[in-house]
Amino acid sequence: MKQGIHPEYKEITVTCSCGNVIKTRSTAGHDINLDVCGNCHPFYTGKQRVVDTGGRVERFNKRFSIPGSKK
């Protein structure tokens, strides 16, 4: 590697809003605050909600269907 052309690689702390603290290294040079992490994200915790769009689809089909044509 060439000397003097690479950014400084510093140790930083990444803090999530849930309180999880992760120590890592980065060229950012400053600590980072996150909104969600792997410990509190709904997909990873199993608390994911499924949004039911069945009513919207039926309303769309009812509104834009051609009268007289039925599949």
From Swiss-Prot:
Pfam families recorded for this chain? Ribosomal_L31 (PF01197)
**GO cellular component terms listed in the entry, alphabetical order:** ribonucleoprotein complex; ribosome
Question: What molecular function terms (GO) are annotated for this protein?
Answer: metal ion binding; rRNA binding; structural constituent of ribosome
Gene3D superfamilies referenced in this protein's UniProt entry, alphabetically:
Ribosomal protein L31
Its family remark reads: Belongs to the bacterial ribosomal protein bL31 family. Type A subfamily.
Q: What HAMAP family does its record include? A: Ribosomal_bL31_1
**UniProt-recorded name of the protein:** Large ribosomal subunit protein bL31
Organism of origin is Mannheimia succiniciproducens (strain KCTC 0769BP / MBEL55E)
What's the source species' lineage? Bacteria, Pseudomonadati, Pseudomonadota, Gammaproteobacteria, Pasteurellales
